[in-house]
């Protein structure tokens, strides 16, 4: 037995089938377009690794007819698409014919998973009888059918208030597989701020989440003017620090926190001073001293210097994000926010100063501008602000609702020069995204990056998660296109299925009602220990914190953080010169007035949640 000669194989069959029939059997291929849920966003398949020799989208090298598919009378059978290779030579799991949607490209491929990581992306099959097989299938291989499905990396929510452990399940079922933030439960400090303060609480939360099927990292409290209290939190296991105005985000605290972060290579996240008590925006920017920092909800109502926190977006060292309560701007956004804000920040409607504080944060002009800044790639990330005004299960939904609203209001989004340069440097293929192509690939990559690769880069975990690339942790989400972004088909953690919609367990098959999301085998404690990651600082790992606490999850260090700049944000690196009129709240980016109308109707909404 030996590898088949591709030249000989090319002559074995010349039968052709209609493109529609092909898509029904194997999913869309190069040039086909797919609608995302009920939005007006259309992706186009850029190339197809399952049916091209040498992985090139060249019409002269097509090898259609060798696709693999599982099922009765289909390809993946002994002696056909399944080889005789031993387990160590084949993948543990193959996802067949999936449409990968990633910042790195929108393309068709088979995906191999081995020991919890993505071990290959290419062409699966039996190398003894099929040409150009890069991912051998054997008796040790499980198959997940990706035909007609979209595959993405698991989402990353980088703004979590750990108020309730049930958030983790809700987030997982929405397609989020990594949660970064702080908290200790429904204490007032956690209800308002994303801090896990001190070694005792950090250790307690690390132990409490050790059996939860989610990658997790905790932020310590950064609001202190001397280094030692910050150092002890980093060495206790924090992945970084959070500065929050409710604890006092003074220039001294900011400078001190960033100085320690520089020494320990961890990230600092900040919620700036809404009341401008300890200084104005320029005071805060000055305290940054050109050091990289993740500015939480750099937008209209999340909190921060009123009314001009949006100006921070123009700084090259600032890595800005939005939270989802203001995403996108709708006719209900303003009315919803006042009560939410009062509860979240322990304010009283009976105290005039508290009401004034809340009202100062809610400005329709800056919320509207936030939509456009997201679409321009000036705001780099999206997150939830879970149970602290944000909805933990709606990061992905709100991201794509914003993208759809911006297409409706701003039209087609063509690649900008920075994105072309970025893709050239990364050897990423640009699809035809001119106004005549009819696809939204560029906009799709821009918005997908906001909750996948960009928060991973920002927090020093992009070696492990954040994209669908060779060698990364197999945190994957499989979607039916009609339900993309709303209800996943499968959530895969570290190569095992952790959650899925499942019917009555007593039924004769898996589909009878009631169908709802249930935990699968990959979410139970002994498997969580191999499929999920706890992130810590290198200093904590060096001190053996994980061993001292008896943690069972995979432990990984955050790293390569302090040199990150806005230009490193994939598809979201625009640094405009920002101006905010202090009287009218009008927002300008590079001299352009940013304004848009609130949406009256949204996709991915009620029709998906009737039952």
Swiss-Prot record:
Binding site for substrate: 244
Main localization (coarse): cytoplasm
Location of the Urease domain: 154-611
Catalysis: reaction(s): urea + 2 H2O + H(+) = hydrogencarbonate + 2 NH4(+)
SUPFAM superfamilies found in the cross-reference section: Composite domain of metallo-dependent hydrolases, Metallo-dependent hydrolases
Binding site for Ni(2+) 2: 242, 271, 297
GO molecular function: nickel cation binding; urease activity
Pathway: Nitrogen metabolism; urea degradation; CO(2) and NH(3) from urea (urease route): step 1/1
Free-text comment on the cofactor: Binds 2 nickel ions per subunit.
Annotated InterPro entries: Amidohydro-rel (IPR006680), Metal-dep_hydrolase_composite (IPR011059), Metal_Hydrolase (IPR032466), Urease_alpha_N_dom (IPR011612), Urease_alpha_subunit (IPR050112), Urease_AS (IPR017950), Urease_asu (IPR005848), Urease_asu_c (IPR017951)
Binding positions for Ni(2+) 1 per the UniProt entry: 159, 161, 242, 385
Protein modification: Carboxylation allows a single lysine to coordinate two nickel ions.
Region span, Disordered: 411-434
Top EC group: hydrolase
Domain of life: Bacteria
Sites of N6-carboxylysine modification: 242
One Pfam family per UniProt: Urease_alpha
Subunit structure: Heterotrimer of UreA (gamma), UreB (beta) and UreC (alpha) subunits. Three heterotrimers associate to form the active enzyme.
Name the UniProt record assigns to this protein: Urease subunit alpha 2
Gene encoding the protein: ureC2
């Amino acid at each position: 037995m030996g590898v088949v000669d591709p030249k000989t194989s090319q002559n074995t069959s010349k039968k052709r089938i209609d493109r529609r029939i092909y898509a029904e059997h194997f999913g869309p291929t190069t040039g086909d377009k797919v609608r995302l849920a009920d939005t007006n966003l259309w992706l186009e398949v850029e190339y197809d690794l399952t049916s091209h020799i040498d992985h090139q989208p060249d019409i002269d090298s097509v090898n259609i007819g060798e696709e693999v598919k599982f099922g009765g009378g289909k390809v993946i059978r002994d002696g056909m698409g399944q080889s005789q290779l031993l387990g160590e030579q084949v993948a543990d799991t193959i996802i067949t014919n999936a449409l990968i949607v990633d910042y790195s490209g929108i393309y068709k491929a088979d995906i191999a998973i081995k020991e919890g990581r993505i071990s290959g992306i290419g062409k699966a099959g039996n190398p003894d009888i099929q040409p150009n097989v890069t991912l051998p299938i054997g008796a040790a291989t499980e198959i997940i059918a990706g035909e007609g499905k979209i595959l993405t990396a698991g989402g990353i929510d980088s703004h979590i208030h750990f108020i309730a452990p049930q958030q983790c399940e809700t987030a997982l079922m929405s397609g989020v597989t990594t949660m970064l933030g702080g908290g200790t439960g429904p204490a007032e400090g956690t209800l308002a701020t994303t801090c896990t303060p001190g070694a005792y609480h950090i250790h307690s939360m690390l132990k409490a989440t050790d059996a939860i099927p989610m990658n997790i990292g905790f932020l310590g409290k950064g609001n202190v003017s001397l280094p030692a209290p910050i150092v002890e939190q980093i060495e206790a296991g924090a992945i970084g620090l959070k500065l929050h105005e409710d604890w006092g985000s003074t220039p001294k605290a900011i400078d001190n926190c960033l100085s320690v972060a520089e020494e320990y290579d961890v990230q600092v996240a900040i919620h700036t001073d809404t009341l401008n008590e300890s200084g104005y925006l320029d005071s805060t920017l000055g305290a940054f001293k050109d050091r990289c920092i993740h500015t939480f909800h750099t937008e209209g109502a999340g909190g921060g210097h009123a009314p001009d926190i949006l100006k921070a977006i123009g700084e090259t060292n600032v890595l800005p994000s939005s939270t989802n309560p203001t995403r996108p701007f709708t006719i209900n956004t303003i009315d919803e926010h006042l009560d939410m804000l009062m509860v979240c920040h322990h304010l009283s409607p009976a105290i005039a100063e508290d009401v004034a504080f809340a009202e100062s944060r809610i400005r329709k002009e800056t919320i509207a501008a936030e939509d456009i800044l997201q679409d321009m790639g000036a705001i780099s990330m999206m997150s939830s602000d879970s149970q602290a005004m944000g909805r933990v299960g709606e990061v992905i939904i709100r991201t794509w609702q914003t993208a759809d609203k911006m297409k409706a209001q701003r039209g087609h989004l063509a690649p900008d020069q920075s994105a072309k340069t970025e893709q050239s440097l990364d050897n990423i293929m640009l699809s035809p995204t001119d106004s005549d192509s009819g696809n939204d690939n560029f906009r799709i990559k821009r918005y997908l990056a906001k909750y996948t690769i960009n928060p991973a880069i920002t927090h020093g975990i992009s070696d492990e998660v954040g994209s669908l690339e060779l060698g990364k942790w197999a945190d994957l989400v499989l979607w039916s296109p009609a339900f993309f972004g709303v209800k996943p088909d499968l959530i895969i953690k570290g190569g095992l299925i952790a959650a899925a919609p499942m019917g009555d367990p007593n039924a004769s098959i898996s589909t009878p009602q009631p169908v709802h999301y249930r935990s699968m085998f990959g979410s139970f404690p002994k498997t969580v220990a191999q499929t999920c990651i706890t992130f810590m600082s290198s200093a904590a790992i060096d001190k053996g914190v994980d061993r001292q606490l008896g943690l069972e999850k995979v432990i990984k260090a955050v790293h390569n953080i302090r040199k990150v700049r806005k230009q490193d944000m994939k598809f979201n690196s625009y640094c405009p010169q920002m101006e905010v009129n202090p009287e009218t709240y009008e927002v300008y980016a590079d001299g352009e007035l940013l304004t848009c109308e609130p949406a009256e109707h949204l996709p991915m909404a009620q029709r998906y949640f009737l039952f």
